[in-house]
Amino acid sequence: MVDHNLLQRKKLFLFDLDGTLYLGDRLFPGVRELLSCIRARGGQYRFLTNNSSRSVEAYVQKLTRLGVAAESGDFLTSVDALIHYLREHGGEDRRYYVCGTESMKSQLRAAGFTVAERREDANALLMGFDTELTFQKLEDACILLGQGIPYLATNPDWVCPTAYGFVPDCGSVCEMLWRATSRRPIVIGKPKPLMLSLIHISEPTRPLYIS
């Protein structure tokens, strides 16, 4: 049941993706109708996700395939927030070893950051939701953390929901590294305030966040 009074009062709606609008390739019932109702009543919606494994372009393609109207400007990911944080804190001169997907690496390179493929060339470590994770990456991360280099993570989530259940997310891997190295990262994504603050920069209103 859609609460039309709530839709009328609110003008900006922020939606999480995995496990909120869809699970795997299955869109939840009522999602299309809800989003259409928001737009029809003069509201706007944006999509926020901690999932760093995909690019915005991949998310646009997925939602379009599921029948949801979406453009690249409708999205904010934890990689977007990470890039903003690195720029604000003088991170352009560092060389980053990335425990993340090739998509995450490509986004960082496109933003002007140096991604080191070898740990010997790195002087900072970035952790994401790495669906391409290998034991070699974990070993490299432990060695780098032992050297005391800066350490950041896209998000604190323990698990990511999938069509077949839950899988370990970035937070679980960071916990494993903490057990091995006693190092904890600076965490960027939700529920940290940075991502929402980036939305407020361009949307000066009180949104309704649905996760």
Place the predicted regions along the sequence by residue:
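Short acidic low-complexity segments
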Residues: 4-5, 112-123
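Asp-based phosphoryl-transfer active-site loop
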Residues: 9-27
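Substrate-recognition element of Asp-dependent hydrolases with the DxDx(T/V) motif
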Residues: 15, 35-61, 75, 94-101, ...
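Substrate-recognition/cap helix-loop segment adjacent to the acidic, metal-dependent catalytic center
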Residues: 39, 55-74, 111, 147, ...
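A short, structured active-site edge motif that brings together acidic residues
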Residues: 71-81, 119-122, 156
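Short, charged N-terminal beta->alpha structural module
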Residues: 88-111
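Conserved acidic, metal-coordinating active-site core of Asp-based
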Residues: 120-199
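Single conserved hydrophobic/aromatic residue that forms the stacking wall/gate
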Residues: 200-211
